[in-house]
Amino acid sequence: MTPAWLDRAEYPFATRRVTIEGIGMSYVDDGEGPTVLMVHGTPSWSFLYRHLVRGLRDGYRCVAPDLPGFGLSDKPAGDAYRPEDQARRLTAFIDALGLKDFTLVVHDFGGPIGLAHAVDQPERVRNLVIFNTWMWSLEQSRQVAWLIRALSGRMGRLLYERLGFSVNVLWRQAVRDRRYTPAVHAQYAAALRAPAARHATWIYAREVLGSSAWLEALWQRRERIARLPALLVWGMKDPAFASALPRWRALFTDARVVEWPDVGHAPPEVRGPESAALVRRFLEEPRRTA
């Protein structure tokens, strides 16, 4: 059932559902052609990629799932929202839809979650499109470690679940753009309206450090994706991941890099049509098919 708060002018896509590990997952599957799989982070959902879907669906099959705990997907209670849990479910989702030879698009927590599949099965991925994200342990960052430890306790859980700290504070501050209107913000906030629906956002925050071993193991296998054609699109005003770009740039042997100095954490949101155009040009370069 479509929720009453959903703005169909902004998100006009038909959604489908599939059950993964007993959890109902909503996803967009629009267009025909080579497949482009788009994986969101926190506190976002497939709404983040609406501009990419609009800009690519006339020549590509655009698949954009809502990971469990987010968007229009089920949000069961419990702590099974670690990135490694979500990565396992994403692979099950990919298998359920029979996706192969696809372009993988990732952002934020969608980075390690989606790229884990690429690291495990690089032969199934044709290209990578990477927006502001990371794929390594952040334990050595004293500022990050201090903040996450402070947010991992009872007070942090209260902030995330009762006050919507992730979507109403951190996300807003990280995006910081006049194009991010109250009406657009309402689509992110409404998907996490109830305190119980915000639980996954707190688990994600906790696991920035809690999943450090998994993240570091993922980074140690990074050479498995180093030769994939990659497009790196970076908002350089991002307080979280602006500084991560050089590490990504050094990894890939075949990368196109676009830096937007006036953009924050979410280029697909605030530069949506431009992002779609960049992705299309990247995919249409000689020898590149999604």
Task: Enumerate the language-model features and the residues they cover.
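Active-site loop/oxyanion-hole signature of alpha/beta-hydrolase fold enzymes
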Residues: 20-21, 28-30, 64-107, 277
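Alpha/beta-hydrolase fold catalytic core
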Residues: 1-35, 57-60, 95, 99-100, ...
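Catalytic histidine-centered segment of alpha/beta-hydrolase-like enzymes
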Residues: 263-272, 276
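Conserved serine/cysteine hydrolase catalytic core
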Residues: 196-247
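Conserved HGGG/HGGXW glycine-rich cap/lid loop of the alpha/beta-hydrolase fold
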Residues: 28-72
